[in-house]
Amino acid sequence: MSDVDPQGPFAETDTRPVHDTTPVVPHDVADPWHEFEGWGLVAAQNDIVETPFRRFRRRFVRRRAALVALAFIILIVLVAIFAPLVAPYDPLEQDLRNTLQGPSGSHWLGTDELGRDVLSRMIFGARVSLLAAVQAVGIALVLGVPPGLIAGYFGGWVDTGVSRINDTVMSFPPLLLAIAIVGVFGPNLRNAMLAVGIIFAPRFLRLMRASVMAVKEETFIEASRSIGTPTGRILRTRVLPNATSPMVVQISLSLGFAMLAEASLSFLGLGVQPPEASWGAMVGRAYRFLDQSPTLVLFPGLAIVLAVLAFNVLGDGLRDSVGREVRGA
């Protein structure tokens, strides 16, 4: 037996206790990835996962026109909420000695045919117009989204039947259909917005149906079916959240068109009834005095144009920013 150390002169000295039998791992054959563990930790900390909401926010803030439109809409909402605090006069207070007056220091936007302050009536009219638009769009969502969800997911004869009914409703001229509905139920704001909601419902139905038909082919929907998830739960927690992105855009656009529809029906005397004020009703009553006081039509008409434009610009910004990126777990 040779006394020569087989590991040669470069062997490491084993200074462990005699009872320690753990094998010695030389430094030159230690874990080569140990020194990179810190790098991976730093990379994980610096790698910020961009959620769908963060991605949407990043895209939306780049669209200046949409931000301006959103700020204008928020301003209108705040004015409508705090109308009693903002309005300088009671919107129903009459002053028959100062009728059809132009803008002045005491009445910034003038007075109407009964001497009522136009600015105060516009401020309170903003509340009525906004609430009317929200009511109409809410009715459209309730009437349009559930049938579109069911038709798009199940297809077959269900889809065919729902689509035929939807096409029949869309075949009627919108204004004539609204006039007919208001004529049956009576001329007031609630019935007018019911009519507008019925008119808008087919658009929401078609959009939801198309979105659901695209979503139901995704792999996570197939996975939910394969593990036996109930259909109702799939529709509620998987399909609906992933099909609502286009609806956000449609809601914004429809709010603007609903305000315009309310103004049109009120102009015809089928919406807001005197003495309540809305922008459309103010234009309808002021039209008779166009030659005596042009500003009486100008200011509420301009408010309608700007509000509808703001909702449309906001809808365009949302359309460019939002994406169908929600997923079911």
Language-model features: locations:
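Helix-loop junctions at the membrane-solvent interface of multi-pass transporters
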Residues: 82-86, 153-154, 180, 184-185, ...
